[in-house]
Amino acid sequence: MNDTSERRSNENSESQSNGQTQSSSQQVLEQDEEEDEELTLKYGAKHVIMLFVPVTLCMVVVVATIKSVSFYTRFDGQLIYTPFTEDTESVGQRALNSILNATIMISVIIVMTILLVVLYKYRCYKVIHGWLIISSLLLLFFFSYIYLGEVFKTYNVAVDYITLALLIWNFGVVGMICIHWKGPLLLQQAYLIMISALMALVFIKYLPEWTTWLILAVISVYDLVAVLSPKGPLRMLVETAQERNETLFPALIYSSTMIWLVNMADGDPGLKQSASTKTYNTQAPTAHPRSDSAASDDNGGFDTTWEDHRNAQIGPINSTPESRVAVQALPSNSPPSEDPEERGVKLGLGDFIFYSVLVGKASATASGDWNTTLACFVAILIGLCLTLLLLAIFKKALPALPISITFGLVFYFATDYLVQPFMDQLAFHQFYI
């Protein structure tokens, strides 16, 4: 009887302890979920603010230039990638030419993207660096020279060639150092915004109107496929960078933090620590046969052979309370925990360029009003906000063009062809709502 009562009491105590363990584990899970939600909201809002400012600045520079400098709205030819003219007699021929131009342009973008991924896959870093350096040199020196010259002409500012050469030289050299080497974060961000605006202005000037809208529509679909498709080129690029634990090139990515300190491709810090531990363990010589592998896994490789070898070299260790206190007081060499405030968000410069192309083209081709420009501006920011919200929820690389470009195109055509005529009629008949 006594044995039976003892068994029942033990079973009851075990069931109670199991229930307490399950309830405590559920509480821990709930707390973790709440913390994840708080972090999602916190960093989602923070990242929105971090990217609203540079995107806004880039679009403001483009729109201000379009509204003030007539050079970028004057037709002086087309790019070699868009050989078909839109100055045709029929609408059908113009639509066909714009489709052909957009097809050629998108094909060039796809080929260049695949070439970049292949070069990165096979570690042709010098070729990629040379490619990016040549592009940066053209933007920072040649296109900046054209831009400054047209701005000085517009505002009737007399500047000699020596002064202009000094300005361009200093601007270009400092930009090359900040982008391709090291420099202050704000200066690097300013240069990335500026070269994005210059590239957008080139597209606005030399791309025909219908071709531009088609390119924007198709590039958003391509961006969706390239990032989310399992074999998409941009997804392969990001996954390769994650596998190698490398940062992508600063000339391709706008970063809200130091790009050589914070890597968006970083995973769990515990994975890095385990990877480094595995590397360390594989380098250690094995002094025992493979039959003792289970025991070596349990003690981490510090078996009796290792202890005998250590005692033979440094002698036996006698632990005393004083020595234990002294050891505990020593600073630990554990890797520092990642500061959440240092986590940055990155956006491709191509996204900056196409955002600015949409707003700038709307400003250049709209019916001379600001309503269409402001509508496209707000639409892009709303789309960017939704994209960053999805990024905070899914915690994976997402395309930044589809939502923003779709909203921008819808807002452009709706405002230019519906809202603006309606407002003109209200103003003409002096109706006030």
UniProtKB/Swiss-Prot annotation:
Residue interval(s) of motif PAL: 399-401
Database matches in Gene3D superfamilies: Presenilin (1.10.472.100)
Main subcellular location of this protein, as a coarse class: endoplasmic reticulum
Signal peptide from the UniProt entry: none
Gene Ontology terms, MF aspect: aspartic endopeptidase activity, intramembrane cleaving
Function: Catalytic subunit of the gamma-secretase complex, an endoprotease complex that catalyzes the intramembrane cleavage of integral membrane proteins such as Notch receptors and APP (amyloid-beta precursor protein). Requires the presence of the other members of the gamma-secretase complex for protease activity. Plays a role in Notch and Wnt signaling cascades and regulation of downstream processes via its role in processing key regulatory proteins.
Family to which the UniProt record says this protein belongs: Belongs to the peptidase A22A family.
UniProt protein name: Presenilin-1
Organism the protein comes from: Xenopus laevis (African clawed frog)
